[in-house]
Swiss-Prot record:
An example molecular function term from Gene Ontology annotations: NAD binding
Uppermost EC category: oxidoreductase
Alphabetical UniProt keywords: NAD, Oxidoreductase
Upper taxonomic lineage: Bacteria, Bacillati, Bacillota, Bacilli, Lactobacillales
InterPro entries according to UniProt: D-isomer_2_OHA_DH_cat_dom, D-isomer_DH_CS, D-isomer_DH_CS1, D-isomer_DH_NAD-bd, NAD(P)-bd_dom_sf
Family stated for the protein in its record: Belongs to the D-isomer specific 2-hydroxyacid dehydrogenase family.
Gene3D superfamilies according to UniProt: NAD(P)-binding Rossmann-like Domain
Protein known as: D-lactate dehydrogenase
Length: 333
């Protein structure tokens, strides 16, 4: 019987895992809540493939340990593959899949909601109400329809975000080094990032974490932006120079910042710090600000998305194990 072993299975994933198991009675499924490390590879002994999800690196040592146990089929329940030692994976003959599209709507909706909350100064108003200060001023809001929304990256998520913001009545402009022909026909694209920075009241990032994009939001780019700009990052933490954003907030140039990702988030997000010493003073400062919205990498976190991540990853792994062409293979090496 085919056997698949899954790592880092969360409670919220178990109903969808059970659903997949019930539909595949001829496949033995075992799992753990532990991450995949050299020390936990032994748990998958006898498996034909593994299904994984973690921010921790898939190191050369981890991949070697899997290969030593006869396992070279690995399916991610997420998109990102930048934490995999691809050179080692290629050397060992790994086949890897990911889930590149599990719910663009989940992430795009979150970005749109957070942008609107910043514009309406919701956090500041909520804090006032909690103090029983029910005066209106000075927390007056801005309407989405009065904004020019700049979208950097027009892939699946960026396009859904554009549709949502247009639904509010905003004017939407976009920039992408790979232009979508349909969007280009409709005249969404500006010629450069500088053009977008100069025009946009709200800027939302929807690009990958590749070297060319690291700290694309920095002192220089912020200086080119409009006064009272709103910045939204639901993509990858390293896209933003956090210190530069803090300087922009302190100067008043940036009206508000919504962040679902953070360049130092590994080991901090998805952990309970209540009653404990918080490990990152800079992040604590951002969390405390009335014009900053912090969510711990949960833009994707909906039942729809989690189901797709589990089901598609297991489907992919079974296809690899059976020698078939997987639906969403990752280029190794």
């Amino acid at each position: 019987m085919t056997k698949i072993f899954a790592y880092a299975i969360r409670e919220d994933e178990k109903p969808f895992l059970k659903e997949w198991e019930d539909a595949h009675k001829d496949v033995e499924v075992e799992y753990t809540d532990k991450l995949l490390t050299p020390e936990t590879v032994a748990l998958a002994k006898g498996a034909d493939g593994v299904v994984v999800y973690q921010q921790l690196d898939y190191t050369a040592e981890t991949l070697q340990a899997l290969a030593d146990n006869g396992i070279t089929k690995m399916s991610l329940r997420n998109v990102g593959v930048d934490n995999i030692d691809m050179a080692k994976a290629k050397e060992l003959g790994f086949q890897i899949t990911n889930v590149p599209v599990y719910s663009p709507n989940a992430i795009a909706e979150h970005a749109a909601i957070q942008a609107a909350r910043i514009l309406r100064q919701d956090k500041a108003m909520d804090e006032k109400v909690a103090r029983h200060d029910l005066r209106w001023a000075p927390t007056i809001g801005r309407e989405v329809r009065d904004q020019v929304v700049g979208v950097i990256g027009t892939g699946h998520i960026g396009q859904v975000f554009m549709q949502i913001m247009e639904g509010f009545g905003a004017k939407v402009i976009a920039y992408d080094i790979f232009r979508n022909p349909e969007l280009e026909k409709k005249g969404y694209y500006v010629d450069s990032l500088d053009d977008l920075y100069k025009q946009a009241d709200v800027i939302s990032l929807h690009v990958p974490d590749v070297p060319a994009n690291v700290h694309m939001i920095n002192d220089e780019s912020i200086a080119k932006m409009k006064q009272d700009v709103v910045i939204v990052n639901v993509s990858r933490g390293p896209l933003v120079d956090t210190d530069a954003v803090i300087r922009g907030l302190d100067s008043g140039k940036i009206f508000g910042y919504a962040m679902d990702v953070y360049e130092g988030e590994v080991g901090i997000f998805n952990e309970d710090w209540e009653g404990k010493e918080f490990p990152d003073a800079r992040l604590a400062d951002l969390i405390a600000r009335p014009n900053v919205l912090v969510t711990p990498h949960t833009a994707f976190y909906t039942t729809h998305a989690v189901r797709n991540m589990v089901v598609k990853a297991f489907d992919n792994n079974l296809e690899l194990v059976e020698g078939k062409e997987a639906e969403t293979p990752v280029k190794v090496g």
